[in-house]
């Protein structure tokens, strides 16, 4: 991700062409930009029409999430939130409440809560095995949480709004933003 966060202008065209190829086969592309804000991570955010912010209950993670939300609100139609590594349902909800209160008070905006993923040893175990926890441990707590989030995305409101925004439009916006930086 370091390389992606600091991509050169010469590699931007290659990246955009790769994304354009994907756009022929997929309606949605999710890009994991990791924590923190670099110039090119910000470019991905500003070219998106929706953002899914994934945070943990730790104060530093909440500060990073708030910063992403603050940038995203100017460019995204919707900002979704997932609380990751929560010890329990109450901790996840408290975390979301803190973030929601701050967004409402200081940014005058509502966040869409997609759900939470509980802290689960099978995630660490799967990482050590270099496999997806969802595949090898489909009945784990984390997998069940992920299924709930997936159901909300699939059966709830569509992730991409019903507008004329297409992936090809997005790639064009991304390319112009990255070149400008």
Question: Where are each of the predicted segments found?
Answer:
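NTP-binding/hydrolysis catalytic cores, primarily Walker-type P-loop NTPases
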Residues: 132-181
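Beta-strand-loop-alpha "switch" segments that mediate conformational coupling across diverse proteins
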Residues: 107-134, 145-148
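G-domain G4 guanine-recognition motif of GTPases
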Residues: 56-57, 79-94, 116-123, 136-138
């Amino acid at each position: 991700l370091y390389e992606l966060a600091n991509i050169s202008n010469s590699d931007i065209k290659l990246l955009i062409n790769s994304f354009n190829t994907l756009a022929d086969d997929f309606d949605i592309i999710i890009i994991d930009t990791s924590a923190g804000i670099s110039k090119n991570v910000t470019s991905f955010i500003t070219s998106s029409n929706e953002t899914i912010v994934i945070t943990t209950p730790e104060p530093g993670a909440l500060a990073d999430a708030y910063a992403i939300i603050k940038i995203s609100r100017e460019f995204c139609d919707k900002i979704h939130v997932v609380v990751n590594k929560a010890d329990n349902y109450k901790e996840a909800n408290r975390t979301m409440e803190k973030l929601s209160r701050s967004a409402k008070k200081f940014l005058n905006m509502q966040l869409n809560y997609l759900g939470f993923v509980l802290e689960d040893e099978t995630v660490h175990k799967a990482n050590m095995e270099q496999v997806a926890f969802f595949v090898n441990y489909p009945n784990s707590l984390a997998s069940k949480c992920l299924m709930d989030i997936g159901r909300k995305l699939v059966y709830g409101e569509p992730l991409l709004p019903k507008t004329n925004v297409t992936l090809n439009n997005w790639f064009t916006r991304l390319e112009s933003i990255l070149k400008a930086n």
